[in-house]
Design a protein with these regions (language model features):
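Conserved C-terminal beta-signal and adjacent last beta-strands/turns
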Residues: 127, 375, 388-389, 418-431, ...
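N-terminal periplasmic/intermembrane-space "pro-region" immediately following the signal or transit peptide
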Residues: 1-77, 84-90, 323-326, 337, ...
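Flexible internal linker/loop segments at domain or repeat junctions
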Residues: 343-367, 398-413
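Predominantly the C-terminal beta-signal and adjacent terminal strand-loop region
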Residues: 431-473
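Surface-exposed loop and membrane-interface regions of Gram-negative outer-membrane beta-barrel proteins
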Residues: 59-79, 87-144, 157-160, 206-210, ...
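Signature for the C-terminal beta-barrel architecture of outer-membrane proteins
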Residues: 134-142, 161-338, 380-385, 393-395, ...
Length: 474
């Protein structure tokens, strides 16, 4: 019979348990949804009903994109409303529907605000979810979802449901999710990603209502397996296929780069914990065929060979404010001229705000033609608020390709590879815990030689950007 623990050992174990439970203890979504609408409807049995409303104001000065193609200075007042209803939550089959309403006002006619910000009144989710129980073994749980749905997988760098952006990726198809008794996870999916509509200037300015389109001309499929408890964290292996083709030549046709890609990758990650190191290492390769442009006359298939690497190491101090300092490195391949290959990395349907700064009217940095280390400092003083600041210098991986998401390019390569410095900060504060949260941030882009001297670089100064939004959960 084992000896009973001493008083000192018991105290030490209790302290360790409290420390483990104290991280993370800030969340940008309600820990307990207020269910205001559900309660107002009389709390109907077997239903789940919730929603959110997020107004945002943002502005950009000294545009980094080509001018006058895009406005040199711009503002956007956007609204994102969601309404989620699910029936059958106590049974083996659940029916779910979620409406998205993403609108924008007061932007310039040549604003960079596009379908990433505006998509009025869209049934983003409409699905059946089947509980398949312990199909994968004793102690496991699994489910099959069919219809329209949103999806987060792994790091969210390739497949995601956006959190900051004003519109949300959605897919039509099916997905199977499994979790074993040992906490291993498996996901497989075949989907048709939605093309958001309208996508013309007048339709966007009018917040026109037009249902999004899915078709066999754009398909995403693949699987991910995550091993639990590997080196104190998780290890994920995955592979995704993307098939894309033009949808004809008529008035409503969509011309594409005819991407036929296979994207395998791996990720080793450990979540932040107080008084410990954490890490996130991910390596992705991309192969297949694609065309250089979406022009209908471009019929030349290029061999794709692209890659992306992310490395991150952080440490959280055992202090009341839970300060975390982390070092990051991102390397995404860019394309070269006239080599018969296409080597620019494609992040598929991944999110980027959590790593590279605000998107919306801003968002110069993405996983394409990028070399960028970064340092980040975060604090989490309480469950009510958190904040961070980050510094990131920016280089091009290829001097002849477009830099990240800026649309700035020098095919000659004479503008160099240094794009500039980015400094950003963010503050989040629960005005009413679990019901209303404030989120505000600033970003400063000090332009380097490339963003100043490239042939289509705008004659503007350094870029300033700011936003303020509140989200009400009901």
């Amino acid at each position: 019979m084992p000896a009973a623990p001493t008083e000192k050992e018991t105290a030490r174990a209790s302290a360790a348990k409290a420390k483990a439970q104290s991280w993370p203890y800030f969340a940008a979504a309600p820990a307990q949804p207020p269910n205001v609408l559900y309660k107002a409807l009389g709390e109907p049995e077997n239903w789940r009903i919730s929603g959110s409303f997020r107004p945002r104001v943002e502005g950009i000065a000294n545009q980094f994109r080509p001018v006058p193609t895009f406005a040199a200075n711009d503002i956007l007042n956007s609204y994102l409303t969601t309404l989620y209803v699910e029936y059958g939550i106590k049974g083996p089959v659940r029916l779910g529907v979620e409406l998205f309403d993403s609108r924008g006002y007061f932007q310039q006619r040549n604003s960079s605000a596009f379908t990433t910000e505006i998509n009025a009144l869209e049934p983003g989710q409409a699905y059946l979810n089947f509980d398949t129980g312990d199909l994968g073994g004793d102690g496991s749980k699994s489910s099959l979802t069919v219809g329209r749905f949103t999806k987060n997988i792994g790091s969210r760098r390739l497949v995601s449901r956006q959190q900051f952006r004003n519109t949300i990726n959605a897919y039509t198809g099916l997905t199977y999710d499994w979790q074993g008794a040992n906490r291993d996870k498996f996901t497989a999916l075949w989907v048709m990603p939605h093309t958001r509509l309208p996508d013309d200037v007048n339709g966007l300015l009018d917040n026109g209502i037009e249902f999004d389109r899915e078709s066999l001309n754009l398909q995403l499929f693949g699987a991910s397996y995550t091993f639990a408890d590997i080196l104190g964290g998780t290890f994920e292996l995955y592979g995704y296929g993307l098939y894309e083709q033009d949808s004809g030549t008529g008035l409503r046709s969509v011309q594409t780069r005819d991407r036929r890609l296979f994207t395998p990758g791996m990720r080793l990650a450990r979540r932040p914990q107080v008084g410990a190191f954490d890490y996130d290492f991910e390596a992705i390769y991309q192969t297949g065929l694609a065309r250089e442009t979406a022009a209908a006359t471009d019929l030349r298939d290029l061999t794709v060979s692209a890659y992306f690497v992310h490395a991150e190491v952080g440490y959280t101090l055992d202090h009341a404010w839970k300060p975390r300092l982390s070092l990051h490195y991102d390397h995404a391949s860019g394309d070269r001229n006239n080599d018969g290959k296409f080597t620019r990395f494609d992040t598929l349907f991944g999110a980027r705000r959590f790593e590279y700064g605000p998107t919306g009217l801003y968002g110069p940095v993405q996983r394409a033609n990028l070399i960028s280390p970064s340092i980040r400092a975060e604090i989490t003083p309480s469950k009510v608020w958190d904040a961070f600041v980050a510094y990131r210098p920016l280089w091009l991986e290829s001097a002849t390709d477009t830099f990240a998401a800026t649309l700035i390019r020098d095919r000659s390569g004479r503008s160099g590879t240094f794009a500039g410095h980015q400094i950003e900060g963010r503050l989040r504060y629960w005005i009413i815990p679990n019901e209303m949260i404030l989120d505000t941030g600033l970003a400063y882009l000090a332009k380097g030689d490339f963003l100043r001297n490239a042939p289509n670089a705008p004659d503007t100064g350094d870029t300033f950007y700011g936003y303020l939004n509140t989200t009400l959960f009901f």
